[in-house]
Curated annotation (Swiss-Prot):
Gene3D superfamilies: Ribosomal protein L11, C-terminal domain (1.10.10.250), Ribosomal protein L11/L12, N-terminal domain (3.30.1550.10)
Name under which the protein is recorded: Large ribosomal subunit protein uL11
Organism: Streptococcus suis (strain 05ZYH33)
Gene Ontology cellular-component annotations: cytosolic large ribosomal subunit
Post-translational modification note: One or more lysine residues are methylated.
Gene: rplK
Description of how the protein assembles with itself and partners: Part of the ribosomal stalk of the 50S ribosomal subunit. Interacts with L10 and the large rRNA to form the base of the stalk. L10 forms an elongated spine to which L12 dimers bind in a sequential fashion forming a multimeric L10(L12)X complex.
PANTHER family: 60S RIBOSOMAL PROTEIN L12 (PTHR11661), LARGE RIBOSOMAL SUBUNIT PROTEIN UL11M (PTHR11661:SF1)
InterPro entries: Ribosomal_uL11, Ribosomal_uL11_bac-typ, Ribosomal_uL11_C, Ribosomal_uL11_C_sf, Ribosomal_uL11_N, Ribosomal_uL11_N_sf
Keywords: Methylation, Ribonucleoprotein, Ribosomal protein, RNA-binding, rRNA-binding
Family in the record: Belongs to the universal ribosomal protein uL11 family.
Length: 141
């Protein structure tokens, strides 16, 4: 018989840098997860993606064992890295802070494709372009 999921915990943690310190430790402790076991496994799995923020969904079972799925980094993080800026615009409709090309948007869309509910690469690119515009980025050809 399959184990019954008791809780789902969603976190965004820098790749390879999960520690028992807040906010990771308390979130896992409340769910009854072995914190050191999770941090070691997460850091090992994400060591090759250093510098990125990785969303993770942790399934906690009734016997307090757990499994987790790592997702692709958020589109905003990938866009900031591509544009080389620290943060987006506070007033995106008035102040444009960076420019990204369609080629960069396409690369980000290809990376994000498994996590997006887009039927095609073009649809995924439109989603990423929308995120870029809402951050105060200009999309150019």
């Amino acid at each position: 018989m399959a184990k019954k999921v008791e809780k789902l915990v969603k976190l965004q943690i820098p790749a390879g840098k999960a520690t028992p310190a807040p906010p990771v430790g308390p979130a896992l402790g409340q769910a009854g997860i072995n914190i050191m076991g999770f941090t070691k496994e997460f850091n090992a799995r994400t060591a090759d993606q250093a510098g990125m923020i990785i969303p993770v969904v942790i399934s906690v079972y009734e016997d307090k064992s757990f499994t987790f799925i790592t997702k692709t980094p958020p589109a905003a993080v990938l866009l900031k890295k591509a544009a080389g800026v620290e943060k987006g615009s506070g007033t995106p409709n008035k102040t444009k802070v960076a420019t990204v090309t369609r080629a960069q948007v396409q690369k980000i869309a290809e990376t994000k494709m498994p996590d997006l509910n887009a039927a095609s690469l073009e649809a995924a690119m439109l989603m990423i372009e929308g995120t870029a515009r809402s951050m105060g980025f200009t999309v150019t050809d």
